[in-house]
Amino acid sequence: MRSATVVLAAASTAQAAVSFISFGLAAIGPQLRHEYGLSLAELGAILTANLLGAGLALVGAGVAVDGLGSRAATLAGTALATAGLVAAAESHSGSLLFAGLLVSGVGTAVVPVAGAGALFRRYPAERRAWALGIRQMAVPLGGTVSAVALPALEAVGGVRLALLVGAALVCATGVAFALALGGEARPAGRAPRAFRSILRADGMRRLLVVGCLYVVVLQALISYLVPAVRAAGFSSSVASAAFLTVNVAAMVSRVVWGHVADRASGGRRVRTLVETGAVAAAGALLFAGALHLGVAAVLATALAFGFGALGWNAVLYVMAGERAPVELAGRSFAVAATVVFVVSALCTPPLGALAAHAGWNVFWVVTAVLAGAGAIVAVRLPRTIPG
C-alpha cells in the first residue's frame, strides 16, 4: 500500500487539474459570453456544466470504484474526462460546449470519490479533516492557477486553447493518481442497502441540508464575483485580483477549518461547520457594501467572504463519511458530494437571473441569508466523536 503522503499528494494534484476547468472557467466568463453570445443565466449553466456532470455521476463513480477497483475506475474516468474537454474545445455553439463540459464532468467524478476513500483508509480521525482539507485545498488551487492562466491562454489561442490545456492536465494527473493508488483490494461484496443506510445515518439528512444552503453561497461567490465587480465599475484587472483573492482564501481556509475541526479527536466538527456559515454571512454583507467603496475594500472583504463561503466543504465531507461504517465512507462521501455538486449546478442559472432582475445588492443579501440559515441548521447536528 502506498504511503498516506504519496496518495494525498497525488489525489490533490488530480483534483487541482479537475478544478482548473470546473472552478476556473469563471475567470474567462466575459469572454465566453462574447464568443458564444450567452446571457447571464446561460453563462451560469456553462460554468457549472462540468459540476453537473460530476454530480450526476458521483454515486455511480462510487459503485465503479467498488466494482472495478480504484485504479481501473480512475483510468476509465480520466479517459472520458479528457475526451469531453477535447470535444468542448472543438465546439462552435453554447449547447455543444455545455455537452462537452458535462461529459467531462461525468468522467472526473471518480477522482474525488477514489481520493476520499483512500484518505479515509489512511488517516485517523484526529488528522482526517486536515487531510481532506488539503485535498479540498486543491479545488481553489486549480481555480487560482486558472485565474491567471486561462485569461492568458484565451488571449493567445481563444477558448479552444484554454480547454485543450485543461484536457492535457486532467489526463496527465489522472493517470499519475491511478498509479499512486496502486492495486488496492476491492471489497469482498456489495454492502446490502448501502445508500439507504447512509441516508438513515444519524444527522445525515440535516447535514445534506446544510450542504445545499452553503453550496448556493459558494456558487454565488465563485460564478458571479467577476461580473459583480465589473458591474460596480471596476476594471477587469481588479475583478481578476478579487477572483484570485477568493481562491487564495479558499485554499487557506480549507486547511485551517479542517485543522480546527480535528481538535478534541474530531469532536469539534459541528461547531466548526457552524462557524464557517457565520463567517460567510458576515462576509457577504461586507462585500456588498465594499462594492460601493474602493479597491482595497473589495479585496479585503472578498478575502473574508471567501474564508467562510469556500472553507466548509472538507469539514462537511468528512462528517458525511464518518456517519457511515468505514467500508461505506467513500459512498457516503459520494452521496454528500452528489447533493452538493447537483445543487451547485442547478442553482447557478437562477442566481444569474436574480442578479439580472433584482440587482447585485439584493443578490449578496440573499447569499448572506442563506449562509446564516445553513449555520442555524448546522447547530442542531448530532455531536458525535468519530471512530
Residue spans for each PLM region:
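Cytoplasmic membrane-interface "Motif A"-like loop-to-helix N-cap segments
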Residues: 67-77, 263-277
